[in-house]
Amino acid sequence: MKLTQLACSSIASGLLLLGCGSDPDESGVNRNHPSGSAGNGPGSLDLGEVSTAPGPIETLQTALPTGFVAATGAKNGGDAGQLRGGWHVVGPLGKLPEPSGMACANVLRVLMRDFATFKHPDFGGPKDPQNAPGLVEPTLGAGRKPTRSGKYPKVAVKLDDWYATLKGVNTAYVVDFWLEPVGQSFVLDSSRFFPLDDVESAEAKQSDDDGQPRNFGFTTELHTSFRYAGGEVFTFRGDDDVFVYVDGKLVVDIGGVHGPTEGTVRIDDLSLTQGRVYTLDLFQAERNPTGSNFRIETTLDFADCGSIVDDVPK
């Protein structure tokens, strides 16, 4: 397996900086900032001595970047006022060139895996119970992946499949998320969250809440890190399963097949050391028609753009 980490430094205001997305355009704001950080906790990153030398030029995307799809909502437009951010499917994992010289800003690179919704035991239908806190262990397992607990054996039969690329089971895609600047936060908010609608899929689409054909049955995997300054908040609202780990410990636990559910973590409550860099790992699963909601809102100052593991079977 090959790990690619896309490094970026922070902006002066201490807000979230994410991603390694599209090239700067007329909507961007170029910024030049110091880089370097250190940490030695169990989930922190030892990135060396702090440097006062200028870091890479970053482009804060204040408008939807070229080639991105704006976050989608209800067909009747009733939730148009809350939609924020957007996404861009870069391409299939394992078929992309190594990134180089990419400017980092509020674009976050993730892995999404497309499953055949009704051919996997964990996808395609309601599970009992619908809310399943404690579905995964409270600490990250090997490879920075969640480990299934012994609870709710019928809710997730093959959870190890969700965040692994497996021939005949799923197809992995590299996707960039644009988090839109909103006040002092950055937000991605979609009530019709279907980034993989246009990828080639062997299965027929299912109808969403508006009767529109959609590609259900997918997971999202994010690995990044942030510099803790004090006062930061990370909020996720969505369906179905969502697990967020900070410093290797579970801080948002929304397991099960259910409607939109929200979890918030105040970083000050985690007993971290200010000035150090800590890992953040997010895992999401959309398992059941007809709804798909996804909202991230944060004031975190991310220290890198995300890391991608090429685990495509050779």
Spans of features found by a protein language model:
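Ser/Thr-rich, Pro/Gly/Ala-heavy low-complexity intrinsically disordered linkers and tails
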Residues: 17-62, 66, 71-72, 79
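Extracellular Ig-like/FN3 beta-sandwich strand-entry sites
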Residues: 275-277
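Short, surface-exposed beta-strand/strand-loop-strand elements in extracellular ectodomains
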Residues: 241-253
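Extended carbohydrate-recognition surfaces in non-catalytic/accessory domains of CAZymes
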Residues: 61-230
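Short, solvent-exposed beta-strand-to-loop segments that form ligand-recognition rims
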Residues: 250-267
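Sec-dependent bacterial lipoprotein signal peptides
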Residues: 1-18
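Aromatic-lined ligand-binding clefts that engage carbohydrates, nucleic acids, or primary amines
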Residues: 231-244, 280
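Short beta-strand-plus-loop segments that form exposed binding edges in beta-rich domains
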Residues: 281-291
